[in-house]
Amino acid sequence: MSKNKLSKGQQRRVKANHQRRLKTTAEKADYDDNLFGETSEGIVISRFGMHADVESADGSVHRCNIRRTIRSLVTGDRVVWRPGKDAADGVSVKGIVEAVHDRASVLTRPDFYDGVKPIAANIDQIVVVSAILPELSLNIIDRYLVACEAQDIEPLIVLNKIDLLDDDGLRFVNEQMDIYRNIGYRVLLVSSRTQDGLKPLEAALTDRISIFAGQSGVGKSSLLNALLGLSEDQILTNDVSDVSGLGQHTTTAARLYHFPHGGDVIDSPGVREFGLWHLEAEQITNGFVEFHDYLGRCKYRDCKHDTDPGCALREAVENGKIAESRFENYHRILESMAQVQVKTRKNFSSSDD
């Protein structure tokens, strides 16, 4: 069966109609340039939906729309934006984010549906907050450190609530923290309640953009209150429950704050816990920095660094070169990753039925 060909005139009309539809779609999808002023530099201090709060060079904050051509925008991004002009009838038009500068770093977390999701940009360091209450867990600290190493962002370990320790307890905690000091990590002991140790922490935060990570109940919000000089109703905080020993997480959206002593912090609920299930086993291994000198020295190339004969890592543990707790936590992380990955595959396969 032969097909009727369009005449040249019909082809021109089809093309014109197509271009008109594209133009109409583009006009509906974005914003009129005449509604906005000159371009300026700014930083995103909060992002929600198709809007962002942008701080200009003079410190003023502007609620902005976001160009649909911008595929990714998160708190901490440095942007080019334009303020809105007064429209007809005195209606004020929001500003608009025109472009995003290249990121020096981006903090991401795994998402079961969206893959790896960015949550903050241009971070200089991740403050890993732990505490002796609800529990001092070296396993959790090690998980955060692996995540920091995988993202190539410098960590700072902060142990909160040291005011609850007696002399023997403080001695024990320092012995535990020496494990991390001895492999090059910075460790600070503080109390948000008594403000002990806050001066060294302020110095470590000055002139840097930091983000606080840690489980609920370790006192992240209380620590931020003390560092920012804010009252408790400005950054909400809940005391640890006497019954469960667990605090309640109260922050709901990532936001950038300025420290009075200099430096910035991004407070985000997205970094309460870093999932590691998206990482390869090799990335977990490389996340333990003290392993590096021994990798490649095992007797067998496919060494699992467990009970394998001739394992250089296990030999280093037996010789006191690698902390036994770190080696054990390494295997715990690998085991938990395998369990989550199996569960994830099952969930996705069942959802495809």
UniProtKB/Swiss-Prot annotation:
Gene3D superfamilies associated with the record: Nucleic acid-binding proteins (2.40.50.140), P-loop containing nucleotide triphosphate hydrolases (3.40.50.300), Probable gtpase engc, domain 3 (1.10.40.50)
Keywords from the UniProt entry: Cytoplasm, GTP-binding, Hydrolase, Metal-binding, Nucleotide-binding, Ribosome biogenesis, RNA-binding, rRNA-binding, Zinc
Domain annotation CP-type G: ranges: 104-274
Localisation per UniProt entry: Cytoplasm
Keyword set includes Ribosomal protein: no
Cofactor binding mode and count: Binds 1 zinc ion per subunit.
Broad enzyme group: hydrolase
Chief localisation class: cytoplasm
GO molecular function, one term: metal ion binding
One Gene Ontology term, aspect cellular component: cytoplasm
Listed EC numbers: 3.6.1.-
Keyword Glycoprotein: no
Region of interest called Disordered, as start-end residue ranges on this chain: 1-24
GO biological process: ribosomal small subunit biogenesis
Positions of GTP binding: 160-163, 214-222
Pfam families to which the protein is assigned, alphabetical: RsgA_GTPase
Swiss-Prot/TrEMBL cofactor(s): Zn(2+)
Stretches with biased composition (Basic residues): 10-23
PROSITE patterns noted in UniProt: ENGC_GTPASE, G_CP
Subunit structure: Monomer. Associates with 30S ribosomal subunit, binds 16S rRNA.
Family: Belongs to the TRAFAC class YlqF/YawG GTPase family. RsgA subfamily.
Main function: One of several proteins that assist in the late maturation steps of the functional core of the 30S ribosomal subunit. Helps release RbfA from mature subunits. May play a role in the assembly of ribosomal proteins into the subunit. Circularly permuted GTPase that catalyzes slow GTP hydrolysis, GTPase activity is stimulated by the 30S ribosomal subunit.
Name of the protein this chain belongs to: Small ribosomal subunit biogenesis GTPase RsgA
Naturally occurring in which organism (per UniProt): Klebsiella pneumoniae subsp. pneumoniae (strain ATCC 700721 / MGH 78578)
